[in-house]
A protein has these predicted regions:
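C-terminal beta-strand-loop-alpha-helix "lid" module of Rossmann-like NAD(P)-dependent dehydrogenases
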Residues: 1-185
């Protein structure tokens, strides 16, 4: 229950952060950060999979893994290679059975994982994208609906997509210091 409340409390901050990044990116059209550069010719993608360390979660992990496999297969049919970072021992043990390149994992993180425990494995994907070794990075997790229902999600993490222009005002009165290019870096 505490974890659910923490997740609910963080949602508005995450939404606003994405919106602010979109505003900053639009404010400086001369500069495109590597994380925002769209790559139309997709040759390799990465998935960051968030799962549990223990079982007894009903279909929580299996629904997510099925959703990821469907997405992965659609990319592989197009000749795209796949890399995975698994957070949680259930994801590691599941995806080892498939012909997937697991480039990093973090397991046994406990009830309240610290950012330091995740930075290394997540950075593997970020660096690969920045160095043009990956063309897309997806974040895969179960979205909490209620205690009886979670919805498997596969969301694009990179390239960062700015908010739809229809949701944005024609102008905004933010002053960014330092300049937007430095903030995006």
């Amino acid at each position: 229950r505490k974890a659910q409340e923490r997740m609910k409390a963080l949602r508005p901050y995450a939404r606003m952060m994405r919106k602010i990044v979109g505003h900053i990116a639009r404010a400086n059209t001369d500069y495109v950060h590597p994380f925002m550069a769209d790559r139309s010719d997709v040759k390799r993608i990465g998935y960051i999979v968030l799962s549990t360390d223990r079982g007894l979660c009903g279909g929580l992990n299996s629904q997510l893994f099925r959703r990821i496999l469907l997405d992965m297969r659609s990319w592989q049919e197009k000749g795209v290679e796949v890399d995975l970072v698994c957070v949680g021992s259930k994801a590691v043990s599941f995806f080892k059975r498939f012909n997937v390149n697991i480039v990093g994992s973090a397991v046994q993180l406990g009830e309240q994982p610290h950012v330091e425990q995740l930075v290394g494995v997540i950075k593997v994907m970020l660096d690969s994208f920045e160095n043009s070794n990956l063309d897309r990075v997806y974040l895969c997790y179960n979205d909490f609906v209620n205690t009886m229902s979670q919805k498997p999600e596969v969301k694009t993490l990179l390239p960062v997509e700015a908010d739809d222009k229809k949701d944005l005002p024609t102008y905004w009165d933010y002053i960014y210091e330092p300049d937007p290019a430095e903030l995006l870096d």
